[in-house]
Amino acid sequence: MADGRNLEKVKELAAYRVSEEIYVEEMDSRAMVLEHIKSGARIFLMSNEDENKVFYIGFRTPPDDSTGLPHILEHSVLEGSDKFPVKDPFVELVKGSLNTFLNAMTYPDKTVYPVASCNDKDFQNLMDVYLDGVLHPAIYREPKIFLQEGWHYELESPEDELTINGVVYNEMKGAFSSPESVLDRFTRNVLFPDTTYSNESGGDPAVIPQLTYEKFIAFHRNYYHPANSYIYLYGDMDMAQKLTWLDQEYLGHYDRKDCHADSAIATQQPFEQPVQREITYSVTEEEGTKDRTYLSISTVVGTDLEPVLYVAFQILEYTLINAPGATLKQALIDAGIGQDILGGYDCGILQPYFS
């Protein structure tokens, strides 16, 4: 049984305001939603006896173009910080920490930085490195981080052609070479033409070179603020101690500001009639074009704030497409409609959709 006393001490912390507290029976966890009063940061705690402790901080990072700014920033903030001025602290943590999970992910509308460890001292250090990275990154004094992770020109000799290089630029060239990936991204862009989802948060290689260092810095200054963040703590730990440390080392140094108007995600209004679009992708001469056509049918399904609908479509996705011998998938294959049937329920954005 999760120890409720762990969260009783949290209620006594003057730096925080508790807005909700519940017991989650399925996970034997006591959960609490809080707000850091000075900075406006939101925190969700799940206290239980799981020794695998989890922390993440996430920011709403809606892109207004397809330069891949959120993705490049995700790479860049873990390239050194004020407190940890080493070249690549992320790699050092991969090699030298006791982490059970360590990553950073860019989504179409948010960027998250999760870590986990069973060792409390190691867990505390992981939190420190990640928080200093996202809030106090070296990008302000080291423009070369942007050039390395984003894009830059290269010229080996005067006789060579000018080329473009960069970690994210090359990564997204690879992503855009996959027809399934191209179709998935294009589907989302077409379904939500009037919202941030019409842009490619990961970056379109054709557009990435339009990103400037000045816009890159402005994006971090605007969105990477505690008031635009959500912090998550899970597992067997002294929650009051962790929150006190968060306040003293990081959150308490920030004043609340209104980030929500800029980072708010607009809702796409329904189309008056079904929309059809076509897109092409590259193939080699050896591959040819025979049997290389893809067809996708997608529909928006409510919002991610509807838990019953969410569960229903998770079940439908498994039953119709992903289960062994799934009925819809097998029927389509038997009818000769396609060589293979892919699909599913994408529920990682404000308006989930089924394809």
Residue spans for each PLM region:
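Short glycine-rich loop/turn motifs
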Residues: 31, 40-43, 54, 184-186, ...
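Active-site scaffold of zinc-dependent metalloenzymes
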Residues: 45-61
